[in-house]
Amino acid sequence: MKEYNVGYCAGVYDLFHIGHVNLFRRAKEKCETLIVGVLTDELVIHFKKNPPYIPFEERLQMVESCRYVDRAIPVTFDNIGKIDAWDQLHYDCFFSGDDYSGNEVWMKEKRLLNERGSDIYFFSYTQTTSSTKIKQAIEAQIRKEM
């Protein structure tokens, strides 16, 4: 039996890469059912001020096709917060990369989840690849070709 019944993680998952797969694999090793939230284009634009490279429906399909993911759902303004998502899904653990482990807001949310019988678990961040690094490499190549 695994440590958690239902696990949840959420993200943009633009330019899907090995870091995303590592997160899903590690999360699935700890839970029976893994639900992954994918931020809508509207949310990405709201928070990052730029649209994702890959449209929402395609990002959702890529996440759904990953063998470690049991269910992929849209993340909207109604369920962007970890507590709002918990109210809808009643997950036992929220999984994330450790790049957020010292974040004050995340620690507050961890306490609120603990009060509901849930937790946040941080995995080591995949250092070699990130969407940001991929975007920077693409942009550098475009500038070089101009």
What are the residue ranges of the model-derived segments?
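Nucleotidyltransferase catalytic core that binds NTPs
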Residues: 1-146
